[in-house]
C-alpha cells in the first residue's frame, strides 16, 4: 500500500489555549511494499504520523492518500473503519493488550468481531502461529505462562491474523532481550519481503539501518530529511546536528578506519561488518 502525505498539519487540543502543533505542513511518500523507518527525538511527531496513517487522528490541514483511501479534515468514522481493515498497528509493549484466558481466544477475538465463523477463526489462529514461529500447542496456553518475547509474538499474531496490507510499528522491540529482538525484526523483514508495506517508528538505529529501505527524519513536527540508510548515516555532521546516533556497526567500522584498518565503511549491520573484517584479514594473509 502506497502512502502519500501532502501538506499535512495536525495540532493536539486544537482551538483551545493548550493547542500544540505536532506536525507542520508535512509531505512525503512511502512506496508500496517498502520498509520505511521514522526517526527523531521525543516530540518530533513520529507517533502522530503513525496515528494519522491509521486514521486514529484526522489531519487538520492537507490530506493523506493511503492506497485508494484519502483522509482529510472531512473524513468520517465509517470511511475510516473500512480503511482500518487493511492496517495492522503494533503498539509499544503490545503484549499488554492480551486479555483472554488462552492464546487461541486472544487470536480469534478480532476475526469473530468482524463476523468470521469460530471454526474458520480457529484455523486462521493455527496458521498465524506458524508465521510467528510458535508451536500449535501454544493455542491452549495462557499468555501469562509465556515469556516476554513469546507474548510479544502472540500480540503480533493477533494483528497478522487479519492479513493487513500495511503494518505500523511503534517501537516494536522495546523491552525485549537481544535474541527476541532479532527474532521479531527478522519476522517483520520476512513479512516485508512477502509484499507488506511496513512503517516503523524506532530509536533503535541498528534496526533502522539494517531493515529500512527509506528513513524519514522528523524534527519539531517538520520533515528534516528523507533518504536511504546510506544517505542518512553517511552524513556525520547531519547526524550530530539532529543528535542521531550512528548504528553500532557503522560506528565501529569508522573507528577502525580512523586507526588505519583498511575497511570499507559503507556497511549497514554487524553481519556486513564481520564479512568486511574477514575479507580484509584474508587480503592481508594473501599478501604474506
Curated annotation (Swiss-Prot):
Annotated InterPro entries: AAA+_ATPase, ABC_transporter-like_ATP-bd, ABC_transporter-like_CS, ABC_transpr_CbiO/EcfA_su, ECF_ABC_transporter_ATP-bd, EcfA2, P-loop_NTPase
Cysteine-cysteine disulfides: none
Major place of residence: membrane
Gene Ontology cellular-component annotations: ATP-binding cassette (ABC) transporter complex
Keywords per UniProt: ATP-binding, Cell membrane, Membrane, Nucleotide-binding, Translocase, Transport
Subcellular location(s) per record: Cell membrane
Stored Gene3D superfamilies: P-loop containing nucleotide triphosphate hydrolases (3.40.50.300)
ABC transporter domain ranges (all copies): 3-245
Chain sites annotated for binding ATP: 40-47
Function: ATP-binding (A) component of a common energy-coupling factor (ECF) ABC-transporter complex. Unlike classic ABC transporters this ECF transporter provides the energy necessary to transport a number of different substrates.
Subunit description: Forms a stable energy-coupling factor (ECF) transporter complex composed of 2 membrane-embedded substrate-binding proteins (S component), 2 ATP-binding proteins (A component) and 2 transmembrane proteins (T component).
Protein family membership: Belongs to the ABC transporter superfamily. Energy-coupling factor EcfA family.
Name used for this protein in its record: Energy-coupling factor transporter ATP-binding protein EcfA3
Organism, scientific name: Oenococcus oeni (strain ATCC BAA-331 / PSU-1)
Amino acid at each position: 500500500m502506497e502512502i502519500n502525505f501532502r501538506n499535512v498539519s495536525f495540532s493536539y487540543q486544537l482551538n483551545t489555549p493548550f493547542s500544540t502543533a505536532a506536525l507542520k505542513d508535512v509531505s512525503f511518500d512511502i512506496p508500496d511494499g517498502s520498509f520505511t523507518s521514522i526517526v527523531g527525538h521525543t516530540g518530533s511527531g513520529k507517533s502522530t504520523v503513525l496515528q494519522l496513517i491509521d486514521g486514529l487522528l484526522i489531519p487538520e490541514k492537507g490530506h493523506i492518500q493511503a492506497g485508494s483511501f484519502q483522509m482529510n479534515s472531512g473524513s468520517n468514522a465509517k470511511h475510516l473503519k473500512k480503511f482500518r481493515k487493511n492496517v495492522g498497528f503494533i503498539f509499544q509493549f503490545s503484549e499488554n493488550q492480551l486479555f483472554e484466558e488462552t492464546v487461541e481466544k486472544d487470536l480469534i477475538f478480532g476475526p469473530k468481531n468482524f463476523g468470521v465463523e469460530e471454526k474458520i477463526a480457529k484455523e486462521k489462529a493455527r496458521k498465524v502461529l506458524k508465521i510467528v514461529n510458535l508451536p500449535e500447542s501454544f493455542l491452549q496456553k495462557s499468555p501469562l505462562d509465556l515469556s516476554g518475547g513469546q507474548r510479544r509474538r502472540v500480540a503480533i499474531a493477533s494483528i497478522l491474523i487479519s492479513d493487513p496490507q500495511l503494518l505500523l510499528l511503534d517501537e516494536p522491540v522495546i523491552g525485549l532481550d537481544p535474541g527476541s529482538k532479532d527474532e521479531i525484526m527478522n519476522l517483520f523483514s520476512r513479512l516485508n519481503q512477502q509484499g507488506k508495506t511496513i512503517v516503523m517508528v524506532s530509536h533503535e538505529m541498528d534496526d533502522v539501518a539494517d531493515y529500512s529501505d527509506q528513513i524519514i527524519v522528523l524534527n519539531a513536527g517538520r520533515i528534516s530529511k528523507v533518504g536511504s540508510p546510506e544517505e542518512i548515516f553517511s552524513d556525520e555532521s547531519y547526524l550530530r546536528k539532529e543528535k542521531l546516533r550512528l548504528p553500532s556497526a557503522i560506528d565501529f567500522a569508522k573507528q577502525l578506519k580512523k586507526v588505519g584498518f583498511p575497511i570499507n565503511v559503507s556497511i549497514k549491520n554487524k553481519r556486513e561488518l564481520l564479512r568486511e573484517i574477514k575479507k580484509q584479514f584474508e587480503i592481508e594473509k594473501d599478501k604474506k
